[in-house]
Amino acid sequence: MSRRNFKVLYISGEVSPFVRTSALADFMASFPQALEEEGFEARIMMPKYGAINDRKFRLHDVLRLSDIEVPLKEKTDLLNVKVTALPSSKIQTYFLYNEKYFKRNGLFTDTPVQGELKALAEKVAFFNVGVLETLQRLGWRPDIIHCHDWYASLVPLLLKTVYRDHEFFRGIKTAMTIHNVYRQGVLPFKVLKKLLPDEVCSELHRSGDDVNMLYTGVEHADMLTTTSPSYAEEITGEAGNAFGLSEVLGERNMTLHGIVNGIDTRQWNPSTDKLIKKRYAPERMEGKTENKRALLEEIKLSPDTDRPVVGVIINFDEFQGAGLIAGSLKKLAAMDIQLVICGSGDQKYEKQFREFADAHPETVSLHTDCPDSFIHLAIAGFDILLMPGKIESCGMLQMFAMSYGTIPVAFAGGGIVETIDDYSEKDGYGFIFHDYTPKALVARLGAAVALYHDSERWKEIVGRAMARDFGWKHSAEEYGGLYRELLES
């Protein structure tokens, strides 16, 4: 089989720009396009959440994909499918919709509010079975189904049980990428056993009364990947930084591959970006100052462009570093910076950050609604991007930032050390701290701020950062090789 005949279906709970809560959405926006450029035919399936604007993204109904029956154990539900092309590409993206499961704006989450676990389990079962039923109705048979995170983790098991003897699915291989090992989708078995056949339920990975969805996917996928070699080592090594999955990942170590993320350098390019105030390039950096000024005006901070603007873009949870930022607020307030915090999540942190911003209206701004247009302007307008995540499988924000001449200050976790070279006078283009403490964060940020005020040296580090090539080509070639090996196995 020539590689141009290879077909890959990508399944994800989020894809940018349709909906975004994490770097997974950015990954899905660019990775399938990179694989198409390597000669593969790629398509995407995801849920059609109520938050997705049909008109804005030109979604349209597909008549032959209407009223698809989704057989669950004790009932059969119907789904309909909408489709559009991934922006700036021809990649078909299919949105699976059922009013009961997806009309609400909420996305998949493994930290639902009390009482929503039953609804979440139903949503997951419906979506995973629905993907396979939609493929049959569509008549498009992929060679590989590539599942991303726990939302799609039932598909490998379904193919090896319920759909094992279906001619349409015969020979299809599965790959699974772990983007966030700490988000595992722990769901009640008593709900799933009413939705899934006994042969599936007997293979679910149980812990007491619960099912670990990510663990189940890891056990049954034909190939496993994660988003950097360092992160692969972290989650399989003796340290066991895998939140209960170290053993199964260790057992599957030979099929786990760490490949560093890339970014779409057509979408994330300051010289062509239509979402920023003024385009710029390394040889004409005055545009970056204009974006900084526009950002400060939009978020109503002091228009002092001489002070560095430090940005934080995270989910408000412990793993993404909200606790570390919260513990550093007093020291950050004492620094000569303007601080912009973007994100949402745990209400405890949102309340704390809002109170902090209210107490420092001239120098601190909080944003809990951050559409793509704002993120682009922010990345262009920040001088420094602070990345406090305790666990970062790879991250993409630091690559966006450096491409725009924004210097990252990040904790040394996962793929961070593979994408940021720590600064020294002669090389490096970012700042890394190794102790996960407010003291270490503030010290390394202080070093970056001090360098910012040395304009010549700052110009050098910005130039080195912008000279980096963070495109997908090398990583896409690695994935292409793994796909071919998988199909030959």
UniProtKB/Swiss-Prot annotation:
The name this protein carries in UniProt is Glycogen synthase
Q: Could you tell me the EC number(s) of this protein?
A: 2.4.1.21
Q: Which UniProt keywords apply?
A: Glycogen biosynthesis, Glycosyltransferase, Transferase
Report the Pfam families cross-referenced here: Glyco_transf_5, Glycos_transf_1
HAMAP family (alphabetical): Glycogen_synth
Q: Where does ADP-alpha-D-glucose bind?
A: R20
Region forming the signal peptide = none
Q: Which CDD domains match?
A: GT5_Glycogen_synthase_DULL1-like
| Gene3D superfamilies in the cross-refs | Glycogen Phosphorylase B (3.40.50.2000)
State the pathway, as annotated in the record. Answer: Glycan biosynthesis; glycogen biosynthesis
Entry's family note = Belongs to the glycosyltransferase 1 family. Bacterial/plant glycogen synthase subfamily.
